[in-house]
Amino acid sequence: MKKSAVRILSLLLTLVMLFSSAALPYAFAEQVLITEKTPLLDENGALTKPGYCFNNMYEYDRSAIKANPTRIKEWDFYQISNGRYCIQFTIADISLGGACTVGLFDMQTGKRYDALSLSLLTFGRMGLNSDAMTPQHYSRHLFGFDLDVRVTDTKRTISFSGYAGLEPFKAELSMEMFPNHESLVMAVPFTDADEQHFYFNQKVNCMPVTGIVTVGDLTVEFDPSDSFCVLDWGRGVWPYHENWWWGNGSSRLEDGSICGFEIGWGFGDMSAATENTVFYNGKAHKIGNITLVDQDKKLAGDWMSPWVFTSDDGRFEMTMTPFYDNITQMRVLFIGNICHQVFGKWNGTMTLDDGTVVEIKDMVAFCENSDNMW
């Protein structure tokens, strides 16, 4: 009787596994999917459960952090591009200081325009939100720098007025979101640091953009047919020195579908979750580990030769042909950043969970290497 029961149970488990494999040919048991609301930190300030989700299940509370307050870093970073022009908005509180920055650059000519508003010893006073997707309003109005960011269930809007040098600098932009817009949410520890160090991040891709940016006599229009926004929403307790790789892109395919990707490594211990995700018409598809071929050559300064990416599951096979390196080199006392954000045209294939292969042709996207001391 017991042997028969075991055989039946074994057969049922086999059928379940076969059915699951047929329905979802790409599943990743090694990455931990968070399926219910979970406090991000425990009573000791350590991560409760490292993992990922596509709709945020983590509950972030800055007051629950027990680490050295100078190590707390929070930011909202919006990047909008139409293939030629790119505008970036950063709201950051790295505890020792805070900043709101706006930068517009032309990837054909290299011309750029910047405005910024700085504060010292902020330690959370920038007032950044505890959740990326809930309706909210952030504003900063200080000495001719006026920034408003509004979030609703269906869109985000950014309104800015300031100066790039002596030239008036204005932006009015609206980013649309899909119903139940899925994103990549990840919480991982830094195993080479104190257990209270962690990285909590959400990437919201594939938001079509409508709007106008003006600087002096220059007018740049962003149209939803070819203009997209990514939000990089980050909260965490970081080591002083960290080096990472991050790639991201969105585009509209010939059939009108909206497709994008998020890849990255170097952000702590990613054994429970990686950033690597494909987005297709508002839905997220988790993929395996990504390798950048000849990564060491890039670090040696070979930034403008082709970048070849491959994944261990074959679901992300892409080549970027660079055309612009958005270089940042900054150091103020003991805080510094060197970043090569390389934009290019991406070609290759991305595979969805159901096995559908999406062919990518000349998607304008980027991958960066960033070395931070903060």
What are these model-predicted stretches?
Residues 11-21:
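Bacterial N-terminal signal peptides
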Residues 30-374:
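Structured soluble/peripheral alpha/beta segments that form catalytic or ligand/cofactor-binding pockets
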Residues 19-29:
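Sec-dependent signal peptide cleavage junction
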